[in-house]
Curated annotation (Swiss-Prot):
Record text on subunit structure and interactions: The naphthalene dioxygenase (NDO) multicomponent enzyme system is composed of an electron transfer component and a dioxygenase component (iron sulfur protein (ISP)). The electron transfer component is composed of a ferredoxin reductase (NagAa) and a ferredoxin (NagAb), and the dioxygenase component is formed by a large alpha subunit (NagAc) and a small beta subunit (NagAd).
Pfam families in the record: Ring_hydroxyl_B (PF00866)
Gene Ontology annotations of biological process type: 3-phenylpropionate catabolic process; naphthalene catabolic process
Name of the featured protein: Naphthalene 1,2-dioxygenase system, small oxygenase component
Organism, scientific name: Ralstonia sp
CDD domains listed in its UniProt record: ring_hydroxylating_dioxygenases_beta
Function: Component of the naphthalene dioxygenase (NDO) multicomponent enzyme system which catalyzes the incorporation of both atoms of molecular oxygen into naphthalene to form cis-(1R,2S)-dihydroxy-1,2-dihydronaphthalene. Also able to use styrene as substrate. The beta subunit seems to have a structural role in the holoenzyme.
GO molecular function: dioxygenase activity
SUPFAM superfamilies associated with the record: NTF2-like (SSF54427)
Pathway annotation from the record: Aromatic compound metabolism; naphthalene degradation
Gene name of the record: nagAd
InterPro entries: NTF2-like_dom_sf, Rng_hydr_dOase-bsu
Cellular component GO terms held in the UniProt record: catalytic complex
Keyword annotations from UniProtKB, A to Z: Aromatic hydrocarbons catabolism, Dioxygenase, Oxidoreductase, Plasmid
Protein family membership: Belongs to the bacterial ring-hydroxylating dioxygenase beta subunit family.
Length: 194
């Protein structure tokens, strides 16, 4: 099945390519493996085992990016303005600093302790056509963050990941692009890992 972006004008070329990648060469075993992987990653982040997450899930060459897109009317698209703005654009060292900040006993945001619940859904996975150990993974995320009785935030996002198989049988995250749909944050902050 192919998507004709000339007929389906609301579908971007990127989205059509992603659809083709994930649904034409569907592999049920890979799908199950990746779903289990993302579930384990979500569990580590939910229980705030950030050092374990960095050590076991994140590759040293990670590119971790959270963007927000500006939604324009069709008539405004002719100006070719960049529609994506970085909220985070980080590497391994930046993530490590954020983890250290979370672990700091002086971090007032963790008193009382924050509770997280992540729902990772609509998981699709495909092997890279050129690099056999590279996996393309797309998922949707709902993150519920609760602190005290009255501070509750809910985040929704779409994630496009690249995971690579490493020696010893593990799989590590090498790239994560989080498409966060809110242009203006409706929460206190976005100090979390999506």
């Amino acid at each position: 099945m192919m998507i004709n972006t000339q007929e389906d004008k609301l579908v971007s070329a990127h989205d059509a390519e992603e659809f083709h990648r994930f649904f034409v060469g569907h592999d049920s075993d890979l799908q199950q493996e990746v779903t289990t992987l993302l579930t384990r990653e979500a569990h580590l982040l939910d229980i705030q085992a950030y050092n374990a997450w960095l050590e076991h899930c994140v590759a040293p060459e990670i590119k971790y990016q959270v963007i927000s897109r500006e939604f324009r009317s069709t008539s405004e698209r002719r100006y070719q303005l960049n529609d994506a703005v970085n909220i985070y654009n980080e590497n391994y060292q930046h993530l490590k600093v954020r983890v250290e900040h979370q672990m700091d006993p002086q971090n007032w945001a963790n008193s009382p302790k924050i509770r997280f619940t992540r729902f990772v859904t609509n998981v699709t996975a495909a092997k890279d056509k050129i690099v056999p150990d590279l996996l393309h993974v797309r998922s949707n995320l709902i993150l519920h963050r609760a602190r005290r009785g009255n501070q509750v935030d809910v985040f929704y996002a779409t994630r496009e990941d690249k995971w690579k198989r490493i020696e010893g049988g593990g799989i590590q995250l090498v790239e994560r692009l989080v498409d966060y749909p809110e242009r203006i944050l409706q929460t206190h902050n976005l100090m979390t890992f999506l």
